[in-house]
Swiss-Prot record:
Residues 140-187 are annotated as: Sigma-70 factor domain-4. This is ECF RNA polymerase sigma factor SigK. InterPro entries: RNA_pol_sigma-70-like, RNA_pol_sigma-70_dom, RNA_pol_sigma70_r2, RNA_pol_sigma70_r4, RNA_pol_sigma_r2, RNA_pol_sigma_r3/r4-like, WH-like_DNA-bd_sf. The sigma-70 factor domain-2 mediates sequence-specific interaction with the -10 element in promoter DNA, and plays an important role in melting the double-stranded DNA and the formation of the transcription bubble. The sigma-70 factor domain-2 mediates interaction with the RNA polymerase subunits RpoB and RpoC. The sigma-70 factor domain-4 contains a helix-turn-helix (H-T-H) motif that mediates interaction with the -35 element in promoter DNA. The domain also mediates interaction with the RNA polymerase subunit RpoA. Interactions between sigma-70 factor domain-4 and anti-sigma factors prevents interaction of sigma factors with the RNA polymerase catalytic core. Extracytoplasmic function (ECF) sigma factors are held in an inactive form by an anti-sigma factor until released by regulated intramembrane proteolysis (RIP). RIP occurs when an extracytoplasmic signal triggers a concerted proteolytic cascade to transmit information and elicit cellular responses. The membrane-spanning anti-sigma factor is first cut extracytoplasmically (site-1 protease, S1P), then within the membrane itself (site-2 protease, S2P, Rip1), while cytoplasmic proteases finish degrading the regulatory protein, liberating SigK. A motif (Polymerase core binding) lies at residues 59-62. Gene3D superfamilies: 1.10.1740.10, Winged helix-like DNA-binding domain superfamily/Winged helix DNA-binding domain. Pfam families: Sigma70_r2, Sigma70_r4. Belongs to the sigma-70 factor family. ECF subfamily. It comes from Mycobacterium sp. (strain JLS). CDD domains: Sigma70_r4 (cd06171). The gene is sigK. Sigma factors are initiation factors that promote the attachment of RNA polymerase to specific initiation sites and are then released. Extracytoplasmic function (ECF) sigma factors are held in an inactive form by an anti-sigma factor until released by regulated intramembrane proteolysis.
């Protein structure tokens, strides 16, 4: 018994599929229809085994035959049988489809995770806001009357320094000085210095 050390190459044999592929390369529509009829079940089967989804498999099989129509001239009969060439195209296209779908799914997951706003605890936010307001009101009580009035008019009613000085009938420089001192006092009281 002799061991085979080299792969055995079968002599080149022309088949009906070889002839059909050559005719398809010349844009023969009837030859394309015949090639499709003879090979579609095996090509579709290969694609379905990879994709496991009938809808995607049908679409991918259609893409494969479009590729066959466009590139039948690139088939080299010396490299393998027409069926091997078709099944190689089918397998590659199906694997490409799987990779494409996985990449799209990952992009959607990343987008979804990035675009979801973190949950907001409205109760906690309300409690914090009420506590901050209470602290500010308590600290405002530690200011002089002129400081407190000037800050209330400027920050709560939105008046300018000039408008505050007119409303309180006080010099503009005095108002600015009292507000600066009042804000410094609030910062100290609130522990923000």
């Amino acid at each position: 018994m002799t061991a085979l050390t080299q792969p055995v190459r079968l002599p080149f044999v022309t088949t009906d599929l070889d002839v059909l592929l050559r005719q398809v390369a010349e844009r023969d529509v009837d030859a394309f229809a015949a090639l499709y009829d003879r090979t579609r079940s095996r090509v579709y089967g290969m694609v379905t085994r990879v994709l496991r989804d009938p809808g995607y498999s049908e679409e991918t099989t259609q893409d494969i035959y479009l590729q066959v129509w466009r590139s039948a001239g690139s088939y080299d009969p010396k490299a393998g049988s027409p069926m091997a060439w078709l099944l190689t195209l089918a397998h590659r296209r199906a694997v490409d489809r799987v990779r494409s779908e996985e990449a799209a799914s990952q992009r959607e997951s990343r987008y979804g995770a990035a675009s979801v706003d973190p949950p907001v605890d409205h109760v906690a936010d309300s409690v914090i806001l009420l506590d901050e307001r209470r602290r500010v009101v308590d600290c405002m009580g530690s200011l002089s009357d002129l400081q407190r009035e000037a800050i209330q008019l400027a920050y709560y009613e939105g008046l300018t320094y000039v408008q505050v000085s007119e409303r309180l009938s006080a010099n503009l420089a005095t108002i600015k000085s009292r507000m600066r001192d009042g804000i410094r006092g609030l910062k100290n009281c609130l522990g923000m210095s």
